[in-house]
Amino acid sequence: MNKPVLDIQDRPTVGQWITLSLQHLFAMFGATILVPYLVGLDPSIALLTSGLGTLAFLLITKWQVPAYLGSSFAYIAPIIAAKTAGGPGAAMIGSFLAGLVYGVVALIIKKAGYRWVMKLLPPVVVGPVIIVIGLGLAGTAVGMAMNGPDGKYSLLHFSVALVTLAATIVCSVLARGMLSLIPVLVGIVVGYLYALAVGLVDLSKVAAAKWFEWPDFLIPFADYPVRVTWEIVMLMVPVAIVTLSEHIGHQLVLSKVVGRDLIQKPGLHRSILGDGTATMISALLGGPPKTTYGENIGVLAITRVYSVYVLAGAAVIAIAFGFVGKITALISSIPTPVMGGVSILLFGIIASSGLRMLIDSRVDFGQTRNLVIASVILVIGIGGAVLKISDSFQITGMALSAIVGVLLNLILPGRPQAAENLFEENQSDHVA
C-alpha cells in the first residue's frame, strides 16, 4: 500500500480542504440526487440529509472511518410501493424502520460478533437479490428514457436518453483519474446540455428561484400521521437486511484502501449503527435511506487522502447546497429522459454487481443447493410474486425473494462455514 498523502486523522490546509471536499461532493452528487428524483422526493433534502448523515456516521465511528453516505438505490422500488400504499409519510416511516433494523443489528453484533450475519446472508443469497433489485427497476429506466410526458413513445426523448447514456459510458470506460469517478454527473451534464439544445429544458423556474430557500421538509406528526403497518414493515425491512451485506462489503474495501482493519476497530457495529442513524435522520426530515458510497471510496483510493476532515467538509458543503434554491430548481429542471439514460446504466450495474458478488465469492453453481437458492430468488423477485396474507398485509417481489432466499439457505443442507476474520480473508482475495 502506498503511503497516504493525508492519513485518517490528518488535518488538511484550508486550500486542500475545499478542493478535496469538492471532489467528494462531485463523486456522490449524481447518484444522490437521482434517487429522490426517481421516487418523487425533494433533491435538496437528499443533499442536506446526506451531509447530516455523514457527520453522524463520522461521529459514531469515532472519526476513524473515512466514508461518505448518499442516497441508497436499493430502496427505490420499496419507497415507490410504500408511497403508493400510504403516501410519502408511509415511505418515511418505512425508511426509519430500516434504519432502526441497522441499530438492532449493530447491538447484536456488539454482543455476539458478526459471523451470524455472514451465515444469514451469504453471497448465494445476497447476489441474486441484488440482481433482482437492479432488473426490477429496468422497466422504469426504459420507460423514462423512451416516453414523453404523455406516456407515449418519443424519438426525441429517446435520443436525449441515448446521448446521456453514451456520455456516461464513455466517461466510465475511457476517463482516467477523478473524471472516472463522476460518470453519472458527467452524463447528466452532457444529457442536460443536449436536452437544452433540442428544447426540452425549461429554465424559467431556475430564474425565478431564490438563492436561499428553506427545503420542503417532511416532518412526522406535523406533516403526516405516524402509523406503522405490516405492509410498510414488509416492504422496507427485508431490504435493510440485504443492504447489510453491501455495507460490510464497503467496509472491507475501505479497510483494504486505508490499510486498517475497520471491521475490528472502531468495529463493524459502529459503522452499521452510523449507517442506520444516517437513514433515520434522513427519514425524519423527508429524505431517502442512506448508504456508504463506493464512488467516494474510489476518490480515497485515487487521491490517497484518507482524512475524515475532508469527508466532513464535503458533508458541510452538501448541507449548504440543500438551502440553495437555484440548485434545487436546476435539479428539478433536468428532463426525465436524461435521468432515464443514466438509470439504464446504473440499474444494469446494480444487477451486474450482484453477478460479480457471486463470481468474486466463487459460488459454485455446480452444487444443486446453490443453483436452487439463486434460481428461486431470481424468478420470485423478477416475476413479481406476491404473498397476500390479508387485504392489508402482503409481501411482494423483492422482499419476498429475499425472505425465501434466507429461509432456503437456512433449511437446505450443506451450508458452508462463515469466515472467522473477514479482513484477513479479503486481504488475500480480490474484493471490489
Swiss-Prot record:
GO molecular function: xanthine transmembrane transporter activity
Organism domain of life: Bacteria
Major location category of this protein: membrane
Pfam family, one: Xan_ur_permease
InterPro entries linked to this entry: NCS2 (IPR006043), Xan_ur_permease (IPR006042)
Subcellular location: Cell membrane
Topology with respect to the bilayer: Multi-pass membrane protein
Keyword vocabulary terms for this entry: Cell membrane, Membrane, Transmembrane, Transmembrane helix, Transport
Gene Ontology CC annotation, any one: plasma membrane
Transmembrane segments: 25-45, 65-85, 89-109, 124-144, 155-175, 181-201, 206-226, 228-248, 305-325, 330-350, 370-390, 393-413
Family: Belongs to the nucleobase:cation symporter-2 (NCS2) (TC 2.A.40) family.
Known function: Transport of uracil in the cell.
Name of the featured protein: Uracil permease
Biological source species: Bacillus caldolyticus
